[in-house]
């Protein structure tokens, strides 16, 4: 009797769940692909000489509870306002003051989607890369919202991510994935196939043109100061590349990043700031290498179980040649999606937090590592 009970217990508690799991694994159509060898080099090669690895010690928090996952940050110098897109669909405006406590948050325009990247057009309009809607233009003081484009070459955008504006008015933007939407972006990582594109939109001709395709989660994008090229990031590959506009040529800007890049911003003073949403954790290393692990993680994620660790996010400062200069991070802080330098402060956007984080770079500078 005891033996029968033990056998039945083992069957229902161990063997039966394993049998169900194996069956589900085999039936699921999700098939991850091997990643390029470059993405499997987990040791970072772009290490900055200066570091602040305790930036939360001096951090200030702006709009606590009023900014729901402010993913990107765009600063409008003339009005002294920050524009940011939140998960509830609002593009919000935040006043910039010496004291973080004096900042005022305004619900400006709700796109009805998920606003991510933000840039400013030549005629006062605010350009929004809305993950759900496509590329939008907000004008007339927020009274008019216009869809500029939501497809190219017959393929609709699934995750319109970031946008930058050239001096001639042409918009350059990314569609991170043509297969998975914003709420499924982790599946794009796990599948390991290049669904990303970089495109241009000409406001004069209204033409949308695909400049690059087959990218591994095309993310942040920023025009160069000399307007000859833009820099864009591929999150999965942990690299950023230059695209020379007139030559239609690509070259690596920086690779072997110490984390996964999100947005990139030029500060007008000879530097780019690259947000790294997470360091390369052990779970990321293993999943990128082993296909069966990625499928298991995918199946768990389908049922709301998160197995990938995202932590120790950062913002990396690099020069115009892609040489790393300084990095700001803090181990408990994750999901940094943008870093923007405004005056002497560095502002951090996030996919996780309900505020914008700010650090005084003069009081809390990055220093040489011992």
Curated annotation (Swiss-Prot):
Top-level lineage group: Eukaryota
Keyword terms, alphabetized: Glycoprotein, Phosphoprotein, Signal, Vacuole
Pfam families: SSL_N, Str_synth
Glycan-carrying positions: 101
Modified residues (Phosphotyrosine): 303
One GO CC term, this protein: vacuole
Induction of its expression: First induced but later repressed transiently by jasmonic acid (MJ). Slight induction after wounding, both in local and systemic tissues.
Entries under SUPFAM superfamilies matching the protein: Calcium-dependent phosphotriesterase
Signal peptide residue numbers: 1-21
GO biological process, one term: response to wounding
UniProt xrefs under InterPro entries: 6-blade_b-propeller_TolB-like, Strictosidine_synth_cons-reg
Localization per record: Vacuole
PANTHER family: ADIPOCYTE PLASMA MEMBRANE-ASSOCIATED PROTEIN HEMOMUCIN-RELATED (PTHR10426:SF88), STRICTOSIDINE SYNTHASE-RELATED (PTHR10426)
Family per record: Belongs to the strictosidine synthase family.
Record's protein name: Protein STRICTOSIDINE SYNTHASE-LIKE 4
